[in-house]
């Protein structure tokens, strides 16, 4: 059993890593989907209210709320798969929740890219909620407020996403194929 979590600032490549995992047949839990579902359950448009509901869940149920809501979904995936990728961890409390649940079978991967590159990617990807709502500065501040920097500091592995998309995909595939969950993956740039 392996549970691989990704952490990184917006536009760093977490979703792209999740796509690589999904293409390899690995189940992916997108933590943002938990929030989007909560928005819909509350009769709200996820594109407009994602950030507010993410904060509300944490205010209502504690800083590990989204991770706790994710655990049964991950455990369900693990009944049929040996590896699950959790996309979009936002805080050290969430890291602790997953480490408590999965022990040494949990690996946290920091997907990293410089801010200007991330900003350009966000502007280019045309994802709902990226450019028509919250500015990047506000989004980064909100995520840092959740404990993103502390979560990043807890990462077991770092993948630098500054080279080509193919190079990044190769680095993610290397991580997914590693014999041990904490195998270091070299940065994918020269």
Swiss-Prot record:
Pfam families (UniProt xref): AAA_17
Family (UniProt): Belongs to the UPF0200 family.
Record key words, sorted: ATP-binding, Nucleotide-binding
Domain of life: Archaea
Chain positions recorded as ATP binding sites: 8-15
Protein name (record): UPF0200 protein VNG_2452C
A Gene Ontology molecular function term of the record: ATP binding
Sequence segments annotated as region (Disordered): 120-144
Gene3D superfamilies assigned: P-loop containing nucleotide triphosphate hydrolases
Keyword ATP-binding among record annotations: yes
InterPro entries: NTP_hydrolase-rel, P-loop_NTPase
HAMAP family in alphabetical order: UPF0200
ATP-binding found in the keyword field: yes
